[in-house]
Amino acid sequence: TTMKKTILLIALAITSTISYGQSTFDKLEDMDGVMSVVISKDAFKILSKFNFESENEGNEMTEVFKMIENLNEFKTFSTKIPEIATQMESMVKKAVRVQKLTELMRLKEDNSKVWIYVKTTSNKDLVSEVLMLVKGIDKQTNGMSEALIVSLRGAIDINKMSSLVDTFTKNN
């Protein structure tokens, strides 16, 4: 019976950690003043079936579609309400602590701040989660957004992502 109790406690601990991670930002979906976009694993599977290989070999869209076939979930939440933006920041800080995310980088320009966190894996080129918080961006978005959370989960190849970001940055 001691063994059963131990196994039950471990199972509960793992389950609560997993469900905490999944529901951390879900409550934002139901809040007034929050815009959300959620894309599921099934949607990524469908999107990855589109074939852009032939004449588009090597272009950005091909690389994007190769990358998304390993994604499980994409969520983004934004608000223009400062009080909700503060709540969102607290939620991200708690998620970072509970899920043991590693800070990848942070950036501050004027009143805007960006934090990017990742969940590392044993493979140094892959992360299982990318979490980004952008706060104080109302001036850049003409009042359309005060804060933004982006959560991406799956097998995320940091090298491919970096390469894509470089490509899009150079093209724009």
Which sequence ranges carry the predicted segments?
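A mature extracytoplasmic/lumenal domain signature
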Residues: 41-43, 80, 120-122, 134-138, ...
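Early exported N-terminus immediately downstream of N-terminal targeting peptides
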Residues: 24-83, 91
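Stable alpha-helical elements in mature extracytoplasmic
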Residues: 43, 84, 88, 157-160, ...
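C-terminal partner/receptor-binding element of secreted or periplasmic proteins
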Residues: 147-172
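Structured segments of extracytoplasmic/periplasmic soluble domains
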Residues: 67-74, 94-98, 167, 171
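Bacterial Sec-dependent N-terminal signal peptides
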Residues: 1-27
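Surface-exposed, polar helix/loop patches in the mature regions of secreted/periplasmic/lumenal proteins
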Residues: 86-146
